[in-house]
């Protein structure tokens, strides 16, 4: 279930996911 949720979330946000990833890294 978690894998599917992450897949849908990543698909919906797409580019935004990268922005959030950078925020998490920083």
From Swiss-Prot:
The keyword Calcium applies. The keyword Calcium applies. Its main location: secreted. Keywords: Basement membrane, Calcium, Copper, Extracellular matrix, Secreted. GO terms for cellular component: basement membrane; extracellular region. It is found in: Secreted, Extracellular space, Extracellular matrix, Basement membrane. It comes from the Eukaryota. Belongs to the SPARC family. Appears to regulate cell growth through interactions with the extracellular matrix and cytokines. Binds calcium and copper, several types of collagen, albumin, thrombospondin, PDGF and cell membranes. There are two calcium binding sites; an acidic domain that binds 5 to 8 Ca(2+) with a low affinity and an EF-hand loop that binds a Ca(2+) ion with a high affinity. This is SPARC.
């Amino acid at each position: 279930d978690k894998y599917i949720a992450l897949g849908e979330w990543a698909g919906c946000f797409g580019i935004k996911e990268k922005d959030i990833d950078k925020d998490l890294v920083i």
